């Protein structure tokens, strides 16, 4: 059996439940992430849904990790408030959430916000919100690569049509990777 790597000295004084950080272990893991990414923190976009913690995001930013993926508008806001310069909302942004994302772009102009899109309707919702709030948002076209889980079924013959459709709104940052 392995010895305990996390020992609390004053256990009786800590209210329960409580969120406890083992800082040296977290910092070790963050540095290992960067090492696995070839030493370049700009190659990373960690998902915050697993910890939902501003302090951990701030530690990542201090190490040069500035791009993040979020599952909710609240997580996206937490990332921006913690120093993120690039936040991807990992879901199509429709209805009120499209406006909330555009409002975040106004509130945090130093942060580039993006959302995924898998259908023309989600692109229209996002475009409408971006235009109404006079901001530029990023859009990632989610592609169904054959698993039939999420995304738009990719057909090379329609690729240029998708790009033209997205760019026609004039309010998106569009990058092809």
Residue positions per predicted region:
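Short, surface-exposed alpha-helical recognition segments that flank or form part
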Residues: 21-24, 114
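Active-site-proximal beta-alpha core segment in soluble small-molecule metabolic enzymes
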Residues: 47-177
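N-terminal glycine-rich anion-binding loops that anchor highly charged ligand groups
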Residues: 2-6, 25-56
């Amino acid at each position: 059996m392995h010895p305990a790597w996390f020992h609390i000295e004053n256990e009786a004084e800590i209210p329960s439940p409580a969120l406890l950080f083992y800082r040296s272990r977290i910092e070790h893991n963050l540095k290992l992430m960067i090492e696995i990414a070839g030493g370049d923190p700009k190659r990373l976009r960690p998902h915050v849904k697993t910890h939902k913690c501003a302090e951990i995001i701030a530690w990542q930013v201090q190490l040069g990790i500035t791009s993040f993926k979020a599952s909710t508008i609240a997580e996206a806001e937490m990332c921006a408030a913690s120093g993120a310069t690039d936040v991807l909302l990992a879901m199509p942004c429709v209805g009120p959430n499209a406006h909330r994302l555009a409002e975040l772009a106004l509130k945090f102009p130093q942060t580039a916000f993006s959302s995924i899109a898998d259908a023309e309707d989600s692109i229209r919702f996002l475009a409408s919100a971006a235009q109404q709030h006079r901001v530029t948002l990023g859009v990632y076209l989610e592609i169904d690569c054959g698993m039939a889980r999420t995304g738009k079924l990719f057909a090379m013959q329609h690729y240029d049509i998708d790009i033209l459709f997205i760019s026609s709104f004039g309010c998106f940052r569009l990058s092809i990777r």
